[in-house]
UniProtKB/Swiss-Prot annotation:
Substrate binds at residues 99, 144-148, 211-216, 283-284. One of its GO terms (biological process) is response to caffeine. This is Dihydroorotate dehydrogenase (quinone), mitochondrial. FMN binds at residues 95-99, 119, 180, 211, 254, 282, 305, 334, 355-356. It is a single-pass membrane protein. NCBIfam families: PRK05286.1-2, PRK05286.2-5, pyrD_sub2. The uncleaved transit peptide is required for mitochondrial targeting and proper membrane integration. Residues 31-395 are mitochondrial matrix. The keyword Transmembrane helix applies. It is found in: Mitochondrion inner membrane. Belongs to the dihydroorotate dehydrogenase family. Type 2 subfamily. Its EC number is 1.3.5.2.
Amino acid sequence: MAWRQLRKRALDAVIILGGGGLLFTSYLTATGDDHFYAEYLMPGLQRLLDPESAHRLAVRVTSLGLLPRATFQDSDMLEVKVLGHKFRNPVGIAAGFDKNGEAVDGLYKLGFGFVEVGSVTPQPQEGNPRPRVFRLPEDQAVINRYGFNSHGLSVVEHRLRARQQKQAQLTADGLPLGINLGKNKTSEDAAADYAEGVRTLGPLADYLVVNVSSPNTAGLRSLQGKTELRHLLSKVLQERDALKGTRKPAVLVKIAPDLTAQDKEDIASVARELGIDGLIVTNTTVSRPVGLQGALRSETGGLSGKPLRDLSTQTIREMYALTQGRIPIIGVGGVSSGQDALEKIQAGASLVQLYTALIFLGPPVVVRVKRELEALLKERGFTTVTDAIGADHRR
């Protein structure tokens, strides 16, 4: 315990003592120096800090507001209306970065069109033993086996409730908040865990995510089976509908990329049958694509980043077809450019998310994706993002 406290104090000292350097790099963020971040700053930080310490530092810096507001102005063509809300732009931060709702406002400042917090479990839990995050810089990829490390519902609720009025205004301005729910490792009743999450955090969310696709909690992915999924989602929807007030969040399901054709058909069938509001496609993959170069490529866990990109996009394409384009999809997996985002949108995604790209390219990647996406939309004759959703299926 003493060693953990010492490490925490040391990391806090880095944050405080490094303030001058952080302010300098903040200036570079404001001026959009993508090259500096990708070629010098991010590799330098990775040499200094192990992946989990770097993650903690990033969350802390963002939560303190040390990074300036992005100056890029979202044009009307980037606006999307979906899930009962307006999204100023379609690029969000995926769950996993801000697991405990500590850095929401700082993330909006970077230019994200929406923020997803979590995964949050009912009770606090440590997650899996360290080390549990591994960089594959040669592949622009990460393997993680965090295992739903979480401060728990009570702490996250308190944190988000303190900014509830601020979030209400942000949502009205086109910057919604999503909350990703998980189950505790030792829980024997998954449905009860997710239901508790809905009751506790539902009133604070614009959308909720039922995460049944993390590969790092034993037995979790089995909840994607047709019978199990129907039971779980029926309970979740019942709890959502029972929430007091008129502000009831949309309910989405986050699925894995490692599914059989039958699995995908079953998920689509259950989603249509129960009236699920949306799908998040996809989580990390347990597969290891041929050609990975990173020395740590054989580590156990979920793989994210560039090697996941095409598998994720293909799964989006299939789920859009299986749901006849009637269930909105948030596409995630390997997005680091406007081209990546547009490919997912044309495959059927209404919105996209990124996370791993931040690790290797830094905060400027958010504006880069939006700027490139806008240029590509114009180049290909689309007047809005909405016009491009599912365009591949209309050819």
